[in-house]
Amino acid sequence: MANMTNKITRRSFGALALGSFSALALAACGSSNTSGSSSSASASATGKKVAPSALPSGMGTTTVDGEFPRTVKHFRGETTIKSAPSKVVILSTGQLDGVLSLGVVPVGAATAGDADLVPTYLKTKFSDKSAELDKIAKVGKRTDPDVEAIANLKPDLILINNTNKKDELYESLAKIAPTVVTEGTGINWKQDFLLIAAALGTTEKAEKLMEEYNTKAKSVGQKAGSEKTFSFLYASADRTRIFAKSSFVGSICADASLARPAAAQVEKTSIDLSSEQLDQADGDYLFYGVQGGDESKLTGEALWSTLKAVTEKHAHSVDSDMFFLNAGPAAALGVLETIEKAL
């Protein structure tokens, strides 16, 4: 079957409510729903989902940037960090994006399954730090961190999120170094970024990055207008899903006031689609990724060539790491830039 697509590539408490944030992203897995809802959408319906843009009350720190020691309240209690961290280990989704965006290259990181330790979009974004990125040590997988390998790095700060609820793991990590726990899941990417900044003592820099993101989101939204719908589709080994309101890309669309297909306007991270339901992912613009890079898993489907986005050459293959598998300011800006190029 002809592949009628275009391929786009790209190269705490002290943080107040950030009035410039839009009050409006990707869990490791989404909810499944195979009911046959209509694929039509109201062009004015953005399917907005509020993505927390400030830390929950009482979390973070009241200590000013650059001052140590500092005590940070987080999702597993509170942790005192004695000096500015220089040997950080990150163990969860979005945290590599977050620390690099704040100017810190970690000494160790966990991977998502068999994925690359440093995703391509981060290698491109932070190419000036390529030598340092190459030295990051692998410390197991996000679902099963290697505690011994972490200890051997002698870190002075460990970051993990609260989706890993093993008390014994947190206790083991806290014995190695000060450990700060973010909430996790893509929809919480903004508040988690602020919590990372609170631990590093770089809240002002984080706020400036979010202001840049908000400005870009507004600009892309104005350029896109309110009449076009935007859809995001990802195929892995055992499922194909459209990303919905409670996802990383869903939060970005809400911030940019981009309209979504009806199937994406649900309070879930994603919706599983069968081959017969692929038309529910249609929109004026379709951004898709395939695990392993074999796009025929989608483009070879019988309904693919019937999609409006495909026939009008508005179906774009994108970097899955950036769109669907990570969540942070660098990824968010990359998603917006990719959408803007497609318009």
Where are these regions (language model features)?
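Extracytoplasmic substrate-binding proteins
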Residues: 78, 167-236, 329-343
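A short, structured surface patch at a secondary-structure boundary
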Residues: 96-146
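Structured C-terminal subdomain patch of bacterial secreted/periplasmic proteins
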Residues: 281-343
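Bacterial Sec-exported substrate-binding components of ABC uptake systems
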Residues: 1-94, 205-230, 291-295, 303, ...
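Alpha-helical, coiled-coil/dimerization segments enriched in small aliphatic residues
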Residues: 242-271
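Short helix-initiation/N-cap motifs at beta->coil->alpha
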Residues: 139-146, 266-274
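Proline-aspartate-enriched helix->loop->beta-strand connector
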Residues: 154-160, 178, 283
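Extracytoplasmic ligand-binding site segments that recognize negatively charged/polar headgroups
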Residues: 113-119, 165-168, 183-195, 231-251, ...
